[in-house]
From Swiss-Prot:
4Fe-4S Mo/W bis-MGD-type domain residues: 245-301
SUBUNIT field: Core subunit of respiratory chain NADH dehydrogenase (Complex I) which is composed of 45 different subunits. This is the largest subunit of complex I and it is a component of the iron-sulfur (IP) fragment of the enzyme. Complex I associates with ubiquinol-cytochrome reductase complex (Complex III) to form supercomplexes. Interacts with MDM2 and AKAP1.
One term of GO molecular function: metal ion binding
Lineage: Eukaryota, Metazoa, Chordata, Craniata, Vertebrata
UniProt EC number: 7.1.1.2
Organism: Gorilla gorilla gorilla (Western lowland gorilla)
Binding positions ([4Fe-4S] cluster 1): 124, 128, 131, 137
Function text: Core subunit of the mitochondrial membrane respiratory chain NADH dehydrogenase (Complex I) which catalyzes electron transfer from NADH through the respiratory chain, using ubiquinone as an electron acceptor. Essential for catalysing the entry and efficient transfer of electrons within complex I. Plays a key role in the assembly and stability of complex I and participates in the association of complex I with ubiquinol-cytochrome reductase complex (Complex III) to form supercomplexes.
Protein name stated in the entry: NADH-ubiquinone oxidoreductase 75 kDa subunit, mitochondrial
GO biological-process terms attached to the record: mitochondrial electron transport, NADH to ubiquinone; mitochondrial respiratory chain complex I assembly
């Protein structure tokens, strides 16, 4: 794949981790003075007319321009007059010159915009009453502000056949104004060259040329950047208007990135999920699973407590009966006879409440579904299990070594950051593991974990690349640590990171060692002292097992004694609920105010957008009620009190949107030398190799019909490619 030539000079791009469009920093003496409607403003050389206008608060209309995409300059809506210039200019593409006087509201500027708008509306169907973009449409807003009140066009309008690009994005291409935002997003951000234009002039069309699915994990973002109703959401079609919905700022838990989102609800139902700006995490994008899996929140839900009767069937019961049965078991068994497993969607408040409850019965067998090696530094040092460089820090790196991970599907927004740096900053990327399509070129070093030993010893050619780097990153996927030689892999990567710091040009506070997690609850669980993996439970099977949202299938009925009493607390009837003796229905992430910690160690909060269905309750409240019935009441009654307890155990869990600086890398490396384990010859294979593996990874996405349609569409598309029809 060739790198796309982005015209940085026209938009003044810099290599900044905070955003894609930045003006190049220069000394104050190099600033040039321009005037916007007579108002003086000092700007850097290379600043565009549009950026200069925005600096003084003057909004210029635009359709094709987007601050995170390259400049196209083809909609002509941003035309402005430059004093003494013979013609109006495109503000988005024209760099300013010293002394220019930009006239944004002159008669010539107004007439130019009216003319452009008249041509755009000449072929637009004007079907706003049935368009899902109505109420948040740039064409509506700008035609009202900058257009004329009548049209001179009396001929027949152009019509275009709609394209089928998959089960997520609905196309009504007659509405398309050829701004090419979607094409540039696909090529530059998503790294998938599926979209383009065919024809020219009045016959120009945007599409995939041949009918095919838009194969990207970020495809839904073209809905947001489309300025008209040409690209809309298929699952959301004809369901609500934006002014009818209530918007709640929250975060996503479909992966460990912690993307910021807006949950739109109406009448107690989640209608759609949109991205929310956070420059340090997801910028303005979200993954398709984040955006479209919300329909799984209303399917296969646990709405009432259930108990297993004498016939072995689960039947509905009251909260009092269910909690009394569980309380009786907790009173009957103590210590190692009681254990708990936390799943991937559990919040920090529930984790600390469950920890306190089990401590009341003298048990510390608290495990997570995801394995993380405890040998060496293990989870004792926080820097040993975090993405220490941070997500935004990727843009400062000059070399990235990926080990046993496929970030494109395990953490799509992190992968988008890598691609962004590769595209704009000439980042060099290498991979140890199965060859996968990461949307950017990389050096494939092989799939054997023993390559790590060669790099650490300096005998591998890539060792020299790392040595010469000024800001290298080694990113180890948590999926690689699920292997039997996970401790040896972690020790080898830690050794590489330490040797890089000692022998290369790394200076200052730059961190080399990074762990990329896949599930939202893992970092908070490790912060609270949970033991990674369920090996301790397999070795010493308990009499009472508490499954807190554990739907990963890490343990089955066959792994436990026949008389083991299993309690499942969660929000979906997925993998864990069918094996339980008692089911306690909990709340999903859109139904509670809760704390989650992402892979870089940043604590963030979800907010209540809708109420839990039926009799379901927030997880920490269920555990608090259970403790009272069992006669071991936990010392908190409100959410604030629970968070005070969180602060006592791990203060960083309540420092929201803050990252605690990681350290103790040298100590972690010294402890890693104590690991007495050999690397296996088995290849490093991440669990999510293709996009089909991306869509259904947890209880919510597995319950989503939309995600099931995506898997079906990808499967059928792959079969069509493998078995072409013979004419």
């Amino acid at each position: 794949m060739l790198r796309i030539p982005v015209r940085k000079a026209l938009v003044g791009l810099s290599k900044s981790p905070k955003g894609c469009v930045r003006t190049t920093a220069t000394a104050a003496s190099n600033l040039i003075e321009v005037f916007v409607d007579g108002q003086s403003v000092m700007v850097e050389p290379g600043t565009t007319v549009l950026q200069a206008c925005e600096k003084v608060g003057m909004q210029i209309p635009r359709f094709c321009y987007h601050e995170r995409l390259s400049v196209a300059g083809n909609c002509r809506m941003c035309l402005v007059e430059i004093e003494k210039a013979p013609k109006v200019v495109a503000a988005c593409a024209m760099p300013v010159m010293k002394g220019w006087n930009i006239l944004t509201n002159s008669e010539k500027s107004k007439k130019a915009r009216e003319g452009v708008m008249e041509f755009l509306l000449a072929n637009h169907p004007l079907d706003c009453p049935i368009c899902d973009q109505g109420g948040e449409c740039d064409l509506q807003d700008q035609s009202m502000m900058f257009g004329n009140d009548r049209s001179r066009f009396l001929e027949g309008k152009r019509a275009v056949e709609d394209k089928n690009i998959g089960p997520l994005v609905k196309t009504i291409m007659t509405r398309c104004i050829q701004c090419t935002r979607c094409i540039r997003f696909a090529s530059e951000i998503a790294g998938v060259d599926d979209l383009g234009t065919t024809g020219r002039g009045n016959d120009m069309q945007v599409g995939t040329y041949i009918e095919k699915m838009f194969m990207s994990e970020l495809s839904g973002n073209i809905i947001d950047i489309c300025p008209v109703g040409a690209l809309t959401s298929k699952p959301y079609a004809f369901t609500a208007r934006p002014w009818e919905t209530r918007k709640t700022e929250s975060i996503d838990v479909m992966d460990a990135v912690g993307s910021n989102i807006v949950v739109s609800t109406r009448t107690g139902e989640v209608m759609r999920i949109l991205p929310r700006m956070h420059e340090d995490i997801n910028e303005x994008w979200i993954s398709d699973k984040t955006r479209f899996a919300y329909d799984g929140l209303k399917r296969q839900r646990l709405t009432e407590p259930m108990v297993r009767n004498e016939k072995g069937l689960l039947t509905y019961t009251s909260w009092e009966d269910a909690l009394s049965r569980v309380a009786g078991m907790l009173q009957s068994f103590q210590g190692k006879d009681v254990a708990a497993i936390a799943g991937g969607l559990v919040d920090a408040e529930a984790l600390v409440a469950l920890k306190d409850l089990l401590n009341r019965v003298d048990s510390d067998t608290l495990c997570t579904e995801e394995v993380f090696p405890t040998a060496g530094a293990g989870t004792d040092l926080r820097s040993n299990y975090l993405l220490n460089t941070t997500i935004a820090g990727v843009e400062e790196a000059d070399v990235v070594l990926l080990v046993g991970t496929n970030p494109r599907f395990e953490a799509p927004l992190f992968n988008a950051r890598i691609r962004k740096s590769w595209l704009h900053n000439d980042l060099k990327v290498a991979l140890i593991g199965s060859p996968v399509d990461l949307t950017y070129t990389y050096d494939h070093l092989g799939d054997s974990p023993k390559i790590l030993q060669d790099i650490a010893s300096g005998s591998h050619p890539f060792s020299q690349v790392l040595k010469e780097a000024k800001k290298p990153m080694v990113v180890l996927g948590s999926s690689a640590l699920q292997r039997n030689d996970g401790a040896a892999i972690l020790a080898a990567v830690s050794s590489i990171a330490q040797k890089i710091r000692m022998t290369s040009g790394v200076t200052g506070d730059w961190k080399v060692m990074n762990i990329l997690h896949r599930i939202a609850s893992q970092v908070a669980a490790l912060d609270l002292g949970y033991k990674p993996g369920v090996e301790a439970i397999r070795k010493n099977p308990p009499k009472v097992l508490f499954l807190l949202g554990a739907d990963g299938g890490c343990i089955t009925r066959q792994d436990l004694p026949k008389d083991c009493f299993i309690i499942y607390q969660g929000h979906h009837g997925d993998v864990g609920a069918p094996i339980a003796d008692v089911i306690l229905p909990g709340a999903a992430y859109t139904e509670k105010s809760a704390t989650y910690v992402n892979t870089e160690g940043r604590a963030q909060q979800t907010k209540v957008a809708v109420t839990p269905p039926g009799l379901a309750r927030e997880d920490w409240k269920i555990i608090r009620a259970l403790s009272e019935i069992a006669g071991m009441t936990l010392p908190y009654d409100t959410l604030d009190q629970v968070r005070n307890r969180l602060e006592e155990v791990s203060p960083n869990l309540v420092r929201y949107d803050d990252i605690e600086g990681a350290n103790y890398f040298q100590q972690a490396n010294e402890l890693s030398k104590l690991v007495n384990q050999q690397l296996l010859a088995d290849p490093l294979v991440p669990p999510q190799l293709t996009i089909k593996d991306f869509y259904m990874t947890d209880s919510i996405s597995r319950a989503s019909q939309t995600m099931a349609k995506c898997v079906k569409a990808v499967t059928e598309g792959a079969q069509a490619v493998e078995e072409p029809s013979i004419c």
